[in-house]
Amino acid sequence: MAKLTVKDVELKGKKVLVRVDFNVPLKDGVITNDNRITAALPTIKYILEQGGRAILFSHLGRVKEEADKEGKSLAPVAADLAAKLGQDVAFIAGATRGAELEAAINALEDGQVLLVENTRFEDVDGKKESKNDEELGKYWASLGDGIFVNDAFGTAHRSHASNVGISANVEKAVAGFLLENEIAYIQEAVETPERPFVAILGGSKVSDKIGVIENLLEKADKVLIGGGMTYTFYKAQGIEIGNSLVEEDKLDVAKTLLEKANGKLILPVDSKEANAFAGYTEVRDTDGEAVSEGFLGLDIGPKSIAKFDEALTGAKTVVWNGPMGVFENPDFQAGTIGVMDAIVKQPGVKSIIGGGDSAAAAINLGRADKFSWISTGGGASMELLEGKVLPGLAALTEK
């Protein structure tokens, strides 16, 4: 990566601004999954060990109006982070700017840390954070000593005041360890993969993945398709899909992708079908591709699992984004489990999960530790897989 990283700058005695991704799920004020906080620890600890004073920025959820602030404070995150670091984390509830926040920042000593309140509280007044308000970016930049560390891969595809805005107003904007690793794993897998390179794409909508499929058809040796979008590809070929999910307005796109694919695009050959999405009374495997009338496909079937297993044999690089079925339901997990197991059993494979539902599936189904890398950013990893330039990354200082 030709951008400066946190190891390229002198941190001792400096107020270092850090964009992290602490957008964690909360239930009744309790964090239900702290992976994103854990993922940011190496960068935060490094800054503190080097004698820097870390000033952390993060968003949490969506905030459009005053009422949305309820339950969106980063206070529980500050407490969790303090426990993980084993030291106090300064935090002023509700403060994204102002004299009290500035005083707390100026009171920091080397090796101490402060968390600024949810950056999206600034969205209540004209979406200042989300629209990268120039004045806000300048103000936040003024709170530090000219160094900004972006370690929030999850928002790297956004142009916000807390990433791009601060970057534009500091002397050096650098990548943290998490951002550096994310880019290294995903970009290298797509741009300079060890071959054979197999991409696996699931999820429900073709519309979400058109750019990704197009880019990966050029880069990968094989592209396997599963999940709900299977049925749009089926219908585009005149295959009966029963009541399965379909994007009627994307049938032509699916047809074009199949024509362009030169045999690289591999579709399932059977499905697990049910007579309803919820409250079903019958679940069965289809004989072939066609889904029965009155039924809908909710997972890939056993023949497809075997076919995908065969397609993955000998793969050296695998990028997976999107589950094969409705994995949250035990009746429709087999496809996702089968594909995960087929990936991780390949000797010497570099296996990457592109965030979002696939990451949740690997974690919930106990396979997370078997993968080389699990991305922390769904949308950002999708855009990297699409070959797009991420604004948060582009804004960093060149080496």
Curated annotation (Swiss-Prot):
Top-tier EC class: transferase
Pathway per the UniProt entry: Carbohydrate degradation; glycolysis; pyruvate from D-glyceraldehyde 3-phosphate: step 2/5
Localization? Cytoplasm
Q: Which GO terms describe its biological process?
A: gluconeogenesis; glycolytic process
SUPFAM superfamilies noted in UniProt: Phosphoglycerate kinase (SSF53748)
Q: Could you tell me which Pfam families the record lists for this protein?
A: PGK (PF00162)
Q: Where does substrate bind?
A: 21-23, 36, 59-62, 120, 158
Q: Cite the binding residues for ATP.
A: 209, 297, 328, 355-358
In the UniProt record, the signal sequence range is none
Alphabetized Gene3D superfamilies for the sequence: Phosphoglycerate kinase, N-terminal domain (3.40.50.1260)
Please report the name of this protein according to its UniProt entry: Phosphoglycerate kinase
Organism (species): Streptococcus suis (strain 05ZYH33)
Its gene name is pgk
